[in-house]
C-alpha cells in the first residue's frame, strides 16, 4: 500500500492498536519547559514513579525568563517559582537541562533542531502547541497537555488516534521580497484557522523545496494556526546537510546509515491524501494580519476588509469587534499604519537566517522616532553566531534592543509586554486579543517586514526599500 510521510512515521511507532483505532504510540523525544511540566513531575512524585527515559528527554527554560539584565534574576514571583521548580524536578529525576547560564539555552523549538535532538522520522512531543515546528525535519511533532506530559515521562508512550492526511502544495517560485512567513500566512488566509482540523499537513511543491531549514520551520511552526495537529516537510539533502555534525545527531558512518533510512520516509508517489490544497507561489506577496486571528490576513498593498461584505451575520459581528479592538477602519490601507513596537523573535522567526533578513533592512538605517524595537535571538547559539557575524552591531547602531534568548514578547508571560493600545509589528505566531499584553494590538509579519516597520515607523512594503542581499 502506498503511504504518506505521516503514515510511515506513525506506523513505525505503533506499539499496539486498540479496537476503537486508538494507538499506543512510542515517543522518541520529549521536550520539557517550565510552564507545562510542574504538575506532571508532581504526579510522578506522588505515584512513586521515575522518568522512563531521561536520555530521551530534554528540559529548557524559555517562556518566563527575562531577556535583559539576567544578573538581576527573575523578578516576577510566579515566573521565578516555575523556573525554580523545573530546576528542582530535573535534578531529582535526572533529566538533561539547559539552564539560563548554558549557551545552549533558548526557545525549546529552536534548541531541539539546532542541537540535533530532533531528527527525521522521530516522534516528538512537548507541552507546547508549536511543537509542530520540528516537523520541518521530517518528524511527527505535536503539542500535548500536562496530563500527557506525565504519561510520556512515565511510559515514553502516548494514546493517540491517527490524524487524516492533508497535502498543501505550493507550486512555482516565490517572488523576490517574499518569505516563508508570507507563505504560511497566505496558506492560513486561504484555508482558515480550522482548515487543518483533524489533519496533519504535509507541505510540498517547488516553493517549499526551495526553502532553507529556517523557512521550513516557520511554515511547520504555524501549522497549528491552520488548525492542524502537526506539519511536515519530507527530509531531503537540505535537511541532511543542515543536520550533519549537530551535537545530538548521529556522527560519521552512523549518520550516513541514518540518511539512507531518512530518504525512505518521503511519501510514495500516488499516496492518498484526504484533502489537497494548492497555492501558486507567484501570487504570494508580503502579508500582514489585520485582525485578532492569524486567518485575518491581507496583502501589504491591500486594505482593511469591510464587515458589511461578509457572508453571514456572525462573521460581520466578529469582524466589527476585531476592527474595534485593533482600532482600524474598513477600507483603510494596511500600509502606512503607524506602529509603536516591533518584535523580532519567537519560535517562528528567531533563527540566524531570520536575524540576517532583518539586519539587511536595518543596516544603514535607524529605528523611527517613537518606536521601540526588540531583537530576541531564539537561543544562546543563535545569539553567539549573530554576534560573530556582527549582526548585533548592525541592530544596536540602528537603535534596536539586542536581547538574551527567550520567548519574550510572543506572549505576556515575562517582562516583555505591550501596554494597552500599543500597536506591534511582530514576527510571532498569534495575534489574539491580549496575547502580547492586555490591550495590545498585534500584526503578524516576516522579519524583513518587521524591520521595515521599525525603520519607517509604520507597516511598510519591504519591496519598496532598497535592500542589499548580504549583511
Swiss-Prot record:
One of its GO terms (biological process) is L-leucine biosynthetic process. GO terms for molecular function: 3-isopropylmalate dehydratase activity; 4 iron, 4 sulfur cluster binding; metal ion binding. [4Fe-4S] cluster binds at residues 347, 407, 410. Keywords: 4Fe-4S, Amino-acid biosynthesis, Branched-chain amino acid biosynthesis, Iron, Iron-sulfur, Leucine biosynthesis, Lyase, Metal-binding. Its EC number is 4.2.1.33. It comes from the Bacteria. Its cofactor is [4Fe-4S] cluster. Pathway: Amino-acid biosynthesis; L-leucine biosynthesis; L-leucine from 3-methyl-2-oxobutanoate: step 2/4. Binds 1 [4Fe-4S] cluster per subunit. InterPro entries: 3-IsopropMal_deHydase_lsu (IPR004430), Acnase/IPM_dHydase_lsu_aba_1/3 (IPR015931), Acoase/IPM_deHydtase_lsu_aba (IPR001030), Aconitase_4Fe-4S_BS (IPR018136), Aconitase_4Fe-4S_dom (IPR036008), IPM_dehydratase_rel_enz (IPR050067), IPMI_cat (IPR033941). CDD domains: IPMI. It holds the Pfam family Aconitase. It catalyses: (2R,3S)-3-isopropylmalate = (2S)-2-isopropylmalate. Disulfide bonds: none annotated. Belongs to the aconitase/IPM isomerase family. LeuC type 1 subfamily. Heterodimer of LeuC and LeuD. Catalyzes the isomerization between 2-isopropylmalate and 3-isopropylmalate, via the formation of 2-isopropylmaleate. This is 3-isopropylmalate dehydratase large subunit. It comes from Granulibacter bethesdensis (strain ATCC BAA-1260 / CGDNIH1).
Amino acid at each position: 500500500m502506498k503511504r504518506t510521510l505521516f503514515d510511515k512515521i506513525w506506523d513505525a511507532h505503533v506499539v499496539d492498536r486498540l479496537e476503537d483505532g486508538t494507538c499506543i504510540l512510542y515517543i522518541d523525544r520529549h521536550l520539557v519547559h517550565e510552564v507545562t511540566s510542574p504538575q506532571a513531575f508532581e504526579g510522578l512524585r506522588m505515584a512513586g514513579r521515575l522518568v522512563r527515559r531521561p536520555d530521551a528527554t530534554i528540559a529548557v527554560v524559555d517562556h518566563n525568563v527575562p531577556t535583559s539584565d539576567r544578573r538581576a534574576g527573575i523578578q516576577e514571583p510566579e515566573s521565578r517559582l516555575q523556573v525554580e521548580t523545573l530546576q528542582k524536578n530535573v535534578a531529582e529525576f535526572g533529566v538533561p537541562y539547559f539552564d539560563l547560564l548554558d549557551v545552549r539555552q533558548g526557545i525549546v523549538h529552536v534548541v531541539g533542531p539546532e542541537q540535533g535532538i530532533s531528527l527525521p522520522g522521530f516522534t516528538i512531543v512537548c507541552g507546547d502547541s508549536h511543537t509542530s515546528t520540528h516537523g520541518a525535519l521530517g518528524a511527527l511533532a505535536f503539542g500535548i497537555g500536562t496530563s500527557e506530559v506525565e504519561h510520556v515521562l512515565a511510559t515514553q508512550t502516548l494514546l493517540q488516534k491517527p490524524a487524516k492526511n492533508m497535502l498543501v502544495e505550493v507550486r512555482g517560485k516565490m517572488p523576490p521580497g517574499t518569505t516563508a512567513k508570507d507563505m504560511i500566512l497566505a496558506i492560513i488566509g486561504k484555508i482558515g484557522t480550522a482548515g487543518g482540523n483533524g489533519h496533519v499537513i504535509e507541505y510540498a511543491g517547488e516553493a517549499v523545496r526551495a526553502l532553507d531549514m529556517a523557512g521550513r520551520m516557520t511554515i511547520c511552526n504555524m501549522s497549528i494556526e491552520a488548525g492542524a495537529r502537526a506539519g511536515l516537510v519530507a527530509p531531503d539533502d537540505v535537511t541532511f546537510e543542515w543536520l550533519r555534525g549537530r551535537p545530538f545527531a548521529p556522527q560519521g558512518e552512523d549518520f550516513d546509515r541514518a540518511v539512507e533510512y531518512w530518504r525512505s520516509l518521503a511519501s510514495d508517489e500516488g499516496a492518498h491524501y484526504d484533502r489537497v490544497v494548492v497555492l501558486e507561489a507567484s501570487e504570494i506577496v508580503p502579508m500582514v494580519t489585520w485582525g485578532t486571528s492569524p486567518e485575518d490576513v491581507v496583502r501589504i498593498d491591500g486594505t482593511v476588509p469591510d464587515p458589511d461584505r461578509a457572508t453571514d451575520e456572525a462573521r460581520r459581528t466578529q469582524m466589527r469587534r476585531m476592527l474595534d479592538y485593533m482600532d482600524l477602519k474598513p477600507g483603510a490601507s494596511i500600509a502606512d499604519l503607524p506602529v509603536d513596537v516591533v518584535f523580532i523573535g519567537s519560535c517562528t522567526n528567531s533563527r540566524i537566517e531570520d536575524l540576517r533578513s532583518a539586519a539587511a533592512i536595518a543596516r544603514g538605517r535607524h529605528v523611527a522616532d517613537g518606536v521601540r524595537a526588540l531583537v530576541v535571538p531564539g537561543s544562546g547559539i543563535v545569539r553567539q553566531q549573530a554576534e560573530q557575524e556582527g549582526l548585533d552591531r548592525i541592530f544596536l547602531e540602528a537603535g534596536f534592543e539586542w536581547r538574551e534568548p527567550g520567548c519574550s514578547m510572543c506572549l505576556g508571560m515575562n517582562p516583555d509586554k505591550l501596554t494597552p493600545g500599543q500597536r506591534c509589528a511582530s514576527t510571532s505566531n498569534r495575534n489574539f486579543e491580549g496575547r502580547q499584553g492586555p490591550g495590545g494590538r498585534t500584526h503578524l509579519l516576516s522579519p524583513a517586514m518587521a524591520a521595515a516597520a521599525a525603520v519607517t515607523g509604520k507597516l511598510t512594503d519591504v519591496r519598496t526599500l532598497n535592500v542589499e542581499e548580504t549583511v
